[in-house]
C-alpha cells in the first residue's frame, strides 16, 4: 500500500501536503507527452507522490516508468510549484496541496506502454494542438512555462 493510501485510511479526505514529481517529456518535434488520466478523465502530465525513503529523482523515475513505460538517464529540475498552484480535489473527495517538482526527463528511451491503470491514453501534443480538457495542475505548470515549455531541448 502506498504512503498516501495508508495516510488516507487514517485521515480520510481531509487536505494533506504531498511532495511529488511531475515529468516533462519532449519529443524531437517539440511536442509534450501527456496522459489521459483514469482518475480525473482529463489530460495531465506523468507524475506522482513521493513514497517514504525516496528521493525526488527516484519518484520521477518510478512514476515515468509506471505511467508511460519510458526510462530516463537523468532528470533536470525546472521549477517547484506549491501553495494554491498545487491544490487539487480528486473526484473521490481527497484534497491535497502538492509541492510539485517539475522535472524534464533526459536521455529517454523505451516504448510508450500503459500498464498501471492510471493512463487511458498517452499522446504527444504540440503547443498549437493541446487537448481541450487539461487537468488543473498540469494546466498551471504549462501556463507558468508558456512558450519555454515547447522551446526546451528534446528529452531523447
Say what each PLM segment does:
Residues 1-22:
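Acidic, metal-coordinating catalytic segment for phosphate/diphosphate chemistry
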Residues 27-67:
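Conserved Nudix-box catalytic region and its N-terminal flanking loop in Nudix hydrolases
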Residues 71-81:
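A short coil-to-beta-strand element that immediately follows conserved catalytic motifs
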Residues 25, 102-106, 123-126:
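Short, well-ordered beta-strand micro-motif
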Residues 41-42, 112-156:
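Nudix hydrolase/Nudix homology domain
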Residues 81-111:
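Active-site-adjacent beta-strand/loop module that shapes the phosphate/pyrophosphate-binding cleft
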Residues 18, 38-40, 45, 72, ...:
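Short connector loops at helix/strand junctions that flank enzyme active sites
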Amino acid at each position: 500500500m502506498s504512503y498516501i493510501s495508508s495516510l488516507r485510511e487514517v485521515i480520510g479526505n481531509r487536505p494533506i501536503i504531498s511532495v511529488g514529481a511531475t515529468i516533462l517529456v519532449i519529443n524531437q518535434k517539440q511536442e509534450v507527452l501527456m496522459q489521459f488520466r483514469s482518475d480525473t478523465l482529463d489530460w495531465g502530465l506523468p507524475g506522482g507522490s513521493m513514497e517514504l525513503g525516496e528521493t525526488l529523482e527516484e519518484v520521477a523515475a518510478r512514476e515515468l516508468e509506471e505511467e508511460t513505460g519510458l526510462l530516463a538517464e537523468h532528470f533536470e529540475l525546472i521549477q517547484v510549484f506549491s501553495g494554491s498552484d498545487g491544490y487539487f480535489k480528486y473526484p473521490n473527495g481527497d484534497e491535497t496541496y502538492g509541492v510539485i517538482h517539475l522535472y524534464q526527463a533526459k536521455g529517454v528511451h523505451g516504448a510508450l506502454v500503459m500498464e498501471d491503470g492510471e493512463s487511458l491514453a498517452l499522446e504527444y501534443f504540440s503547443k498549437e494542438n493541446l487537448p481541450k480538457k487539461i487537468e488543473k495542475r498540469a494546466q498551471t505548470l504549462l501556463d507558468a512555462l508558456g512558450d519555454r515549455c515547447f522551446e526546451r531541448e528534446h528529452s531523447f
